[in-house]
Amino acid sequence: MARGATYKVQFKRRREGKTNYNKRYKLVDLDKTRMVVRITSNHTITQLVKIGENGDETLVSATSKNLKEFGWLGNGKNTSAAYLTGYLFGKKALNEGYDETILDIGVQPSIKGTKIYAVLKGALDAGLYIPHNDSILPEDSRIRGEHIAQYAESMDDDEKNAKFANYIRCGLSPEEIPDHFESVKNKIDEATQ
């Protein structure tokens, strides 16, 4: 391991896999605000971050936990919740006077159509300008949860009750997810005008 004078120990955050300093240096060098998106096992976190002398400064923040305030009955880890979190974030950022930013996904892999890009699409639909390529964004039907509704319709009741027990326990039928998504999006629009 650390034997000899030629061994160089990496920075702690690099060893832990939390920070890629090459990417971070390029983002810091741009001197623009960054939309930082982090996906945890249960929630989506989105922050508008500015570089400061004493470290990064968070200007605007939204998490999927905030969606409960607007009546979201689903969990915070699906694509619909990621989109709504990005949409809420975009509305908050515009209200604070920020209309342009760049995306910072950290060490997460960049895969087309994932929750990271659902957050990006939500922020874009809210009115933020973020440089991107349209081919990476997920489809609208997937964001609205139509694939879940179609899958639930093809199941019998016992199988549906077992598979979607958490949704049913919260009072949301899986077939109603697209309509519920639209109602929560409208509530976000009303609250952030």
UniProtKB/Swiss-Prot annotation:
MF (Gene Ontology): 5S rRNA binding; structural constituent of ribosome
Disulfide-linked positions: none
A GO BP entry: ribosomal large subunit assembly
Keywords, in A-Z order: Ribonucleoprotein, Ribosomal protein, RNA-binding, rRNA-binding
Keyword DNA-binding: no
Top-rank taxon: Archaea
Protein purpose: This is one of the proteins that bind and probably mediate the attachment of the 5S RNA into the large ribosomal subunit, where it forms part of the central protuberance.
Family stated for the protein in its record: Belongs to the universal ribosomal protein uL18 family.
Protein name (record): Large ribosomal subunit protein uL18
Organism (species): Methanosphaera stadtmanae (strain ATCC 43021 / DSM 3091 / JCM 11832 / MCB-3)
Gene: rpl18
